[in-house]
């Protein structure tokens, strides 16, 4: 079913709107007919009329018909605005920006094709594909767009997690080196202290001062190494926290998207495919959380 170049669901929505418009149009035409009928019954009771009387009757009829037609045109315009508002509101929920081509509203060929479609839809049970070639058409929106965006976000987080894991290995290596250096410094300090204890009776005051300076320098270097290690550990914790927050945010977006998609497409054939995709993405996120949990710092 592709008479309008739309999928079945959207084409049914168009048919519903055309049915609504036909109903409103029929009511308004009945109102106009009643204006003429009222005129016949209330004013055309004499055998003859003067020119002034005929002019008065026609002017009154013109005013009534003008008011009815104007009211219908205004109401139609407002109705179309409300319809556009519904479409744009739904699009904005998915962060989409729709565009309209006003010039196409006066395309005589397209208008005639729509008229033929209405005629075939409402006057015949045998519908024909008469508008397959109607151009231009809006580019179709992929029903999986939301899931695709979430998938890209998950892939980005996975790549970022790999980078964090690589950085964690580097920091762990640096921490190991720092601990080795610390052990070496402690042993050197102990050796100096032992040497100082065995030779304290023979070392001059200047030599003792030099030794104390050396010990102080070693302590300072050791403290600097510990500070660097602390800063690296803090940076790692911040990165892990950021990744965790991003993961929670994506999981929330995925949950909202799943609920919205279930609501929007639970009557369509695409629902089962979308449900399967969302389930796989949930499994990927659970796996990602387990992998991130391995690198969270212990309290």
Curated annotation (Swiss-Prot):
GO terms for molecular function: identical protein binding; protein-containing complex binding. Self-associates. Interacts with BBS9; the interaction mediates the association of LZTL1 with the BBsome complex and regulates BBSome ciliary trafficking. Keywords: Coiled coil, Cytoplasm. It comes from the Eukaryota. Regulates ciliary localization of the BBSome complex. Together with the BBSome complex, controls SMO ciliary trafficking and contributes to the sonic hedgehog (SHH) pathway regulation. May play a role in neurite outgrowth. May have tumor suppressor function. This is Leucine zipper transcription factor-like protein 1. GO terms for biological process: flagellated sperm motility; negative regulation of protein localization to ciliary membrane; negative regulation of protein localization to cilium; spermatogenesis. GO terms for cellular component: cilium; cytoplasm; cytosol; manchette. InterPro entries: LZTFL1. Residues 96-296 form a coiled coil. The gene is LZTFL1. It is found in: Cytoplasm. Its main location: cytoplasm. Belongs to the LZTFL1 family. Residues 145-299 are annotated as: Interaction with BSS9.
